[in-house]
């Protein structure tokens, strides 16, 4: 299924950046991290709480949603490629 909606505050770019420790932890460069958090916010805005508002959109699928949230929690590495993919679809 779809991952839990982080909430309107939880999808904020600043909250995401703080959670990931953008630029401080050895997770990703500040630029990559900021771009990811912005892409994540756009993703949620576009797809809605359970992907329903993004019906018919390639990006609004549970697999990508789970990947976005795993990266947003710092469970998987935020890479340039991941960011590029998210932004390409959500932008």
Swiss-Prot record:
Localization (cell): Secreted
One record GO biological process: killing of cells of another organism
One Gene Ontology MF term: toxin activity
Keywords: Cytolysis, Disulfide bond, Hemolysis, Secreted, Toxin
Main localization of the protein described in the UniProt heading: secreted
Expression sites by tissue: Localized within the skin and proboscis and are most readily isolated from body mucus secretions.
Bridged cysteine pairs (disulfide): 16-37, 22-33, 47-60
CC per GO annotation: extracellular region
Purpose of the protein: Cytolysin that shows hemolytic activity (on bovine erythrocytes, HC(50)=5.75 mg/ml). This hemolytic activity is completely inhibited by small unilamelar vesicles composed of PC/PG, PC/PI and PC/PS in 1:1 molar ratios (with at least 100 mg/ml concentration).
Family affiliation: Belongs to the worm cytolysin family.
Name used for this protein in its record: Parbolysin P6
Organism: Parborlasia corrugatus
